[in-house]
Amino acid sequence: MSKRDYYEVLGVSRDTSEREIKKAYKRLAMKFHPDRNPGDKTAEANFKEIKEAYEILTDADKKAAYDQFGHAGVDPNRGGGGYGGGQGDFGDIFGDVFGDIFGGGRRGGQRQAARGSDLRYNLELSLEEAVKGLTKELRIPTLATCDLCEGSGAKKGTSATTCGTCHGQGQVQMRQGFFAVQQPCPTCHGRGKIIKDPCSKCHGDGRVEKSKTLSVKIPAGVDTGDRIRLAGEGEAGEFGAPPGDLYVQVSVREHAIFVRDGNNLYCEVPISFSKAALGGEIEVPTLDGKVSLKIPAETQTGRMFRLRGKGVKSVRSHAVGDLLCKVVMETPVNLNDRQKELLREFEATLTGESKKHSPKAEGFFDGVKKFFQDLNS
């Protein structure tokens, strides 16, 4: 009996993508799979036909031969190593195609030992430490490779054997009606190996709890939220697998004087009324020590002064930020009688000349006066 066209079997056109061919196959395979149609010979024949068409049209070489020569190009009886046909195994083909949907499908080879877990260490620094950089000694609790069994988990002189239930895969396939579900092997608990004589130190795990001390170089310029990766310093992998990594998470404590914003530092510097009015020099703090700052006469409170290059050196670009100092005029307190008298005398000298000496205040009170006039008009 002549075979149907493979494209017709799957209900697709000749220019259909492989992805669409797979989608068509999945839809038809679900419909005609023998598990869904027990005892139905027609459904079984249809499934074989669908499976054959799928295997040809998803193999680039076989598809090219079929497109050029038709069924003769993939007929094994005509020589040339064409399509091998055969009944095949319903469970195998179904598991391969639907494995991504139902959680696994077939696995080739034995289960690989798991890589060690990554670790996180929260490191708090002062602003000075973060800006200048330093080397820190960190004590890290972790899982290390057992030195008695060298990570095998087995008693010295013995070795683990491949699990006979899952054949080293660590999982077994449980068929539940139409579906095939992968589950951890109940015999080896997902390891793929059986340890008959476990190590007396690690009790078969291959790893032991241990604390280690690491000398970690913290680069200058780090800030809160930065993370330093130390490759291979995480937990040991199981049974000789590679270790995980250690991530040092940086946070910087608040400073009593400075506030950091990126590479710039900010601070407030109090000045006296007389210094603001007459000008002069004041000392301001930096992370490198005190420096002199010249205050011009008639400086108003809140004025910002920039000290270039006195900020933070970027850990990435190596550009250096600035220190921005905001002067805040401090009202004198705890005045004695003489000081109060001098201030009254000074206040008296300003009478009638407020516009000249306090232009902002004069403008403010003029605005208030106009506001009430408009309100009452």
Curated annotation (Swiss-Prot):
Binds 2 Zn(2+) ions per monomer. It comes from the Bacteria. CXXCXGXG motif repeats lie at residues 146-153, 163-170, 185-192, 199-206. It is found in: Cytoplasm. A zinc finger (CR-type) spans 133-211. Zn(2+) 2 binds at C163, C166, C185, C188. SMART domains: DnaJ. Its main location: cytoplasm. GO terms for cellular component: cytoplasm. Transmembrane segments: none annotated. The J domain is necessary and sufficient to stimulate DnaK ATPase activity. Zinc center 1 plays an important role in the autonomous, DnaK-independent chaperone activity of DnaJ. Zinc center 2 is essential for interaction with DnaK and for DnaJ activity. This is Chaperone protein DnaJ. It comes from Shewanella baltica (strain OS195).
